[in-house]
Amino acid sequence: MSLLAEDTAAADLGLRWKPGFRALGPAFLTELRPTPLPDPPYWVGHSEAAARLLGLPADWRQSEGTLAALTGNLPVAGTLPFATVYSGHQFGVWAGQLGDGRAIMLGETEGGLEVQLKGAGRTPYSRGADGRAVLRSSIREFLCSEAMHGLGIPTTRALCVTGSDARVYREMPETAAVVTRVAPSFIRFGHFEHFSASQRDAELRALADYVIDRYYPDCRSTSRFNGNAYAAFLEAVSERTAALLAQWQAVGFCHGVMNTDNMSILGLTIDYGPFQFLDGFDPRHICNHSDTSGRYAFNQQPNVAYWNLFCLAQALLPLIGDQEIAVAALESYKTVFPREFESRMRAKLGLAEPAEGDRALIEGVLKLMAAEKVDYTIFWRRLSQHMAGGNAEPVRDLFLDRAGFDAWLLSFSERHAQLPRAQAADLMLRSNPKYVLRNHLGQQAIEAASQKDFSAVATLLALLETPFEEHPGADAYAGFPPDWASTIEISCSS
């Protein structure tokens, strides 16, 4: 029986749909419908920017049918929902079959965007779990998805969060919520690992061909690797991943759970769980309370990404056909990451063009910051404001080692001596955000939302969508975290 939502009870979102990933067939997915929540849903937060990206009509939230549909309580006209199967390595250990345990794909729009409901109920891949998401984790994912987009970092998007008074149980009873996620593709490294590990080469090839033809068509005409399109594909994914990690490290973003099933094949930030933007700069910071070994510590992220790419290379080996070629396809990561990272850090310093000594300038200030765990975001913003004509004292006040910082600041000033200061200041203010989604800000929004006050979610979203702007009157959102912020524990259930 077809699950295609043609019945009169279906909600029409005003979107046209096409087969997309579903055309790969039943080996890759299971058709199913979301499980309705027992309590009436309500809007928690929404992104008009994501709505415009999808091409939704201006009044898209006015229909009760839309609210019900984006909570999983009503079918969406023209869709055939499904969940996908994948496998992966979790904390460095092969975990076997995983899959979309609480995410159900509505489908792909004619504009080429997949729409997914996260928290919409059990799937065949839920592994005994309830398939639900809780309000706190849903708000965090919604806000961070849009915050990363505001920062210019590749990411899945979030259209909205809907809530319900239905109870779900984690460490404590909580209320259920659903995030509507949007991306060109939600395909992960783990999708390839699944078919490779089970030696299903035909399905592995079909998946790789689908991804190459849809998202990496230039790999078909490459002269690299003797025209091996699969090796060229691996190299392209490596380069996108390297560029993504450079942006994470430059902005101070700690993902927290970089398992291979949480790695996007398109180089997007995906699966916002126990993430954190650094407060004090600690290269060894571990944001995930569940990560007792520190595998996913902030300074380990670039190495972990390369390890994950090596797992992808192993998965693609039946298609690439030569281990040496597969290893060679990974080499670009080692050049792209440092190049992109230094480029991002130079921009934070207001340096549009590279020069000898820039690396020492970057490493020098990071060392000073790490020694005293100086607030990462505030330091860079204050340095930008100093370059824009402000006093140096607000920057100096961040350091106890004034002599050490003054020596660095002198080197910084000498580097800029022959450069246009206004242009440098403009570059810095465009590269160093004033607002990031700090844990305590998210927590305050979550606590308010749990009392049905969603204004804090909307206020935060407005700031995070344009984080480089000053936003007069919002300085409280750009200040130092309160002492209690250090007691917030986030884990894989977050």
Swiss-Prot record:
CC cofactor: Mg(2+); Mn(2+)
Catalytic residues, chain numbering: D261
EC number(s) on file: 2.7.7.-, 2.7.7.108
Catalytic reaction list: L-seryl-[protein] + ATP = 3-O-(5'-adenylyl)-L-seryl-[protein] + diphosphate; L-threonyl-[protein] + ATP = 3-O-(5'-adenylyl)-L-threonyl-[protein] + diphosphate; L-tyrosyl-[protein] + ATP = O-(5'-adenylyl)-L-tyrosyl-[protein] + diphosphate; L-histidyl-[protein] + UTP = N(tele)-(5'-uridylyl)-L-histidyl-[protein] + diphosphate
Keywords: ATP-binding, Magnesium, Manganese, Metal-binding, Nucleotide-binding, Nucleotidyltransferase, Transferase
Binding site for Mg(2+): N262, D271
Source domain of life: Bacteria
Disulfide bonds: none
Cited Pfam families: SelO
Molecular functions per Gene Ontology: AMPylase activity; ATP binding; magnesium ion binding
Residues annotated to bind ATP: G99, G101, R102, K118, D130, G131, R181, R188, D271
InterPro entries documented for this protein: SelO
Family to which the UniProt record says this protein belongs: Belongs to the SELO family.
Job description of the protein: Nucleotidyltransferase involved in the post-translational modification of proteins. It can catalyze the addition of adenosine monophosphate (AMP) or uridine monophosphate (UMP) to a protein, resulting in modifications known as AMPylation and UMPylation.
Matching NCBIfam families: PRK00029.1 (NF000658)
Name recorded for this polypeptide: Protein nucleotidyltransferase YdiU
Taxonomic lineage of the native organism: Bacteria, Pseudomonadati, Pseudomonadota, Betaproteobacteria, Burkholderiales
